[in-house]
Regions:
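Glycoside hydrolase catalytic-domain context in secreted enzymes
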Residues: 1-261
């Protein structure tokens, strides 16, 4: 079945503009950082409830948000889209956001929330964003990798059904220095096995044909193969299915793996 999804569209005019927009006809609210400034999770849930009704009215069933990244690097251009740098506050706000959109149970009146960007897209080297090759590295001074996991762990405990990893490379945190979407240690070992997530892992947009940090030397079909075996279930922004079909026909990806997704 087709599921229509959307980036945030409720920000006040002249909002962030980086995967977050102000669209006519929808109610207007602050960015996530503005919600964090209220220090009031009930306000976040109220917003999410209203936004859910607006999404349902136009047929949107998946929200490509919230961003549960921690703003630990003040130079990062996407800090406005986070709930700040405090992991406990971000956790509380994330759960309220999810509850408002999804409801207490997932049903026909729910809009799924795709929490992003696992395992945290905030610790960008020099503040450069991972949409660009110059910002591909994520670093963890003070050995604080686990701190960035806290909001995502809390989301998984509260009925998270779909999650998005970021473009960046978690430098020297895993066996390979490759981007999250190609990193089995991140997606299968950490997210699936250690944290216990059993929903859908959807890649960020264009990881095969655009932003494939750490695997630039692989061919397109090899990137598909590596990302699927790493744990990706759904590809954002990629539309060519021929490579997937070929991988299955050549037994490089088992049909059972596709069934799992």
């Amino acid at each position: 079945p087709i599921t229509i999804s959307s980036d945030p569209i409720h920000e006040v005019p002249k909002g962030g503009g980086v995967a977050s927009f102000s669209v006519d006809g929808f109610s207007k609210w602050p960015s996530q950082l503005g919600f964090a400034a209220t220090n009031n999770a009930s306000v976040v849930k109220k917003f999410a409830n209203i936004a859910k009704e607006e999404y349902l009215a136009v047929g949107i069933r998946t929200a490509l948000h919230p961003m549960s990244d921690l703003a630990t690097e003040p130079r990062w251009a996407r800090n406005f889209g986070t709930f700040g740098s405090n992991a406990l506050m971000s956790s509380e706000m994330t759960v309220a956001y999810m509850s408002g959109f999804q409801g207490e149970e997932i049903n026909q009146e729910s809009v799924l929330t795709m929490v992003k960007h696992f395992p945290g897209g905030g610790p960008q080297k020099d503040g450069l964003d991972a949409h660009l090759f110059s910002g591909k590295d994520q670093i963890y001074p003070g050995n604080n990798f686990d701190y960035h996991l806290i909001p995502f762990e809390e989301a998984v405990k509260n009925n998270l059904r779909v999650i998005m990893p970021y473009y960046g490379i978690p430098v020297d945190q895993t066996q390979e220095n490759v981007a999250m979407a190609f990193n089995k240690n991140i997606l299968s070992d950490l997210l699936r096995e250690d944290i216990g997530f059993n929903g859908v892992i959807c890649s960020d947009w264009g990881i095969i044909t655009g932003r494939h940090w750490g695997v630039n030397d692989l061919s397109i079909i090899e990137r598909y193969e590596k990302s699927i075996h790493a744990g990706i279930d759904q590809f954002g922004g990629e539309t060519d299915t021929s490579h997937l079909i070929r991988l299955v026909n050549e037994n490089k990806v088992l049909e059972s793996r596709i069934d799992d997704s």
